[in-house]
């Protein structure tokens, strides 16, 4: 797995789901070595199967050979009929279990089995749709409660943002915010939907409705990459604003600027424009996984379309115009298409190689003088020798 490892794990709570049948899943916030934070959902039966496999991989540390050598914590088996009370009471057990695992030597705490278990799966990104008859019920661990044992491996510092306008949720997985509300951002999804918490509420909020407290600019926005990354559209989109781009499904484009609000700058030929990142998939990857992610949720609104936005900052956000993107993009493409400039040439027309030692040139050989010139300029002795030789 290289240098990949998990820094922290926090238990956020659990969900009661009804599709395909009633069951419970636990919500974990996982912080990786690159400081990225992801929310994953796992059933207790999955966690227990993970535990059994871990014991098989490390029988000595599991106490299978000698009980006194056991360091892997105990995890009780699931019951036949688990209800909401059992799901709630089990949160403390899970916290202690993963707290114990993360404190073990790296051969266990960073083993591929543990890392793979907490990797984001397609189902973790598949949010319930409004068409579902009964939506999941979320039960959160109190943020400041006395029995808050959700923090498994240490504090996870969440970034704080402020809402610049009222946003009314349109589904059960979103969260309503009012102008001036301060929220903690749990996860920044590339789609432009951020998972936030405010007191005992959690849900998805469009990133365009949020601003940092210390600056109007998003410090984590990367710089443009005019070399471009190849992507494919997995859903058609018709431009609404002048600086957006209309594309059909299945078109190949290049992404030149990935912005955290979920509206990326893409390039098609020499044309650039904004396009929803939710409708893009990296070229060469399975499209079916990305299509699962966009079901039941549309592209987030752009900040330019928000009415009555009220920022606490005096200056507005710094944004490049599409004219600037196009101009810089065209300049980059022209330089890329231009053949390489020849290096300095030597007198014989060949390129000089700086790594090759230079040889001093030999002096030029003068042309041989003619016989008449020799007879005219030579001495009498030389004339007699030349005359006798003829």
UniProtKB/Swiss-Prot annotation:
Post-translational modification: Phosphorylated by PRKCD; phosphorylation induces activation of NCF1, leading to assembly and activation of the NADPH oxidase complex.
Membrane disposition: Peripheral membrane protein
Origin species: Mus musculus
UniProt-listed SMART domains: PX, SH3
Protein keywords: Cytoplasm, Lipid-binding, Membrane, Phosphoprotein, Repeat, SH3 domain
Domain of life where this protein originates: Eukaryota
Disulfide bonds: none
SUPFAM superfamilies per the UniProt record, alphabetical: PX domain, SH3-domain
This protein's GO CC annotations: cytoplasm; cytoplasmic side of plasma membrane; cytosol; dendrite; membrane; NADPH oxidase complex; neuronal cell body
GO molecular function: phosphatidylinositol binding; phosphatidylinositol-3,4-bisphosphate binding; SH3 domain binding; superoxide-generating NAD(P)H oxidase activity; superoxide-generating NADPH oxidase activator activity
Biased composition (Basic and acidic residues): 374-383
Function: Subunit of the phagocyte NADPH oxidase complex that mediates the transfer of electrons from cytosolic NADPH to O2 to produce the superoxide anion (O2(-)). In the activated complex, electrons are first transferred from NADPH to flavin adenine dinucleotide (FAD) and subsequently transferred via two heme molecules to molecular oxygen, producing superoxide through an outer-sphere reaction.
Transmembrane segments: none
Record's subunit section: Component of the phagocyte NADPH oxidase complex composed of an obligatory core heterodimer formed by the membrane proteins CYBA and CYBB and the cytosolic regulatory subunits NCF1/p47-phox, NCF2/p67-phox, NCF4/p40-phox and the small GTPase RAC1 or RAC2. Part of a cytosolic complex composed at least by NCF1, NCF2 and NCF4. Interacts (via C-terminus) with NCF2 (via the C-terminal SH3 domain). Interacts with NCF4. Interacts with CYBB. Interacts (via the second SH3 domain) with CYBA; interaction is phosphorylation-dependent. Interacts with NOXA1. Interacts with ADAM15. Interacts with TRAF4.
One biological process term in Gene Ontology: hydrogen peroxide biosynthetic process
Pfam families: NCF1_PBR_AIR (PF16621), p47_phox_C (PF08944), PX (PF00787), SH3_1 (PF00018)
Modified residues (Phosphoserine): 304, 321, 329, 346
PROSITE patterns: PX, SH3
Limits of the SH3 domain: 156-215, 226-285
Region feature (Disordered): 291-390
Identification of the protein by name: Neutrophil cytosol factor 1
């Amino acid at each position: 797995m290289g240098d990949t490892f998990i820094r922290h794990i926090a238990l956020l709570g659990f969900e009661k789901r009804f599709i395909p049948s009633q069951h419970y899943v636990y919500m974990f916030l996982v912080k990786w070595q690159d400081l990225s934070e992801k929310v994953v959902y796992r059933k207790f039966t999955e966690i227990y199967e993970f535990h059994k496999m871990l014991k098989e991989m490390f029988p000595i540390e599991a106490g299978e050979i000698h009980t006194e050598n056991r360091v892997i914590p105990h995890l009780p088996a699931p019951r036949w009929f688990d209800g909401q009370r059992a799901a709630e009471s089990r949160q403390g057990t899970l916290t202690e279990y993963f707290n114990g695992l993360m404190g073990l030597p790296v051969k266990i705490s960073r083993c591929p089995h543990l890392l793979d278990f907490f990797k984001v799966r397609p189902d973790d990104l598949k949010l319930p749709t409004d068409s579902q008859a009964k939506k999941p019920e979320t039960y959160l661990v109190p943020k400041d409660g006395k029995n808050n044992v959700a923090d498994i491996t240490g504090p996870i510092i969440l970034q704080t943002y402020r809402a610049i306008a009222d946003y009314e949720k349109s589904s059960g997985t979103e969260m309503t915010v009012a102008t001036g509300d301060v929220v903690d951002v749990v996860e920044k999804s590339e789609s432009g939907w951020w998972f936030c918490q405010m007191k005992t509420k959690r849900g998805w909020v469009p990133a365009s409705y949020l601003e940092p407290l210390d600056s109007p600019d998003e410090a984590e926005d990367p710089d443009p990459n005019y070399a471009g990354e190849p992507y494919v559209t997995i859903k058609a989109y018709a431009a609404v604003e002048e600086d957006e781009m209309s594309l059909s499904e299945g078109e190949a484009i290049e992404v030149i600027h990935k912005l955290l609000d979920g509206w990326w700058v893409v390039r098609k030929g020499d044309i650039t424009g904004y396009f929803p990142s939710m409708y893009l998939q990296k070229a060469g990857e399975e499209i079916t996984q990305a299509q699962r992610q966009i079901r039941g949720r549309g592209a987030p609104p752009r900040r330019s379309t928000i009415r009555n936005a009220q920022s606490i900052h005096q200056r507005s956000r710094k944004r490049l115009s599409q004219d600037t993107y196009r101009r810089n993009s065209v300049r980059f493409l022209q330089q890329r298409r231009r053949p390489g400039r020849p290096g300095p040439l030597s007198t014989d027309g060949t390129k000089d190689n700086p790594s090759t030692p230079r040889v001093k040139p030999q002096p030029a050989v003068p042309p041989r003088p003619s016989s008449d010139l020799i007879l005219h300029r030579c001495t009498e002795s030389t004339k007699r020798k030349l005359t006798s030789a003829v």
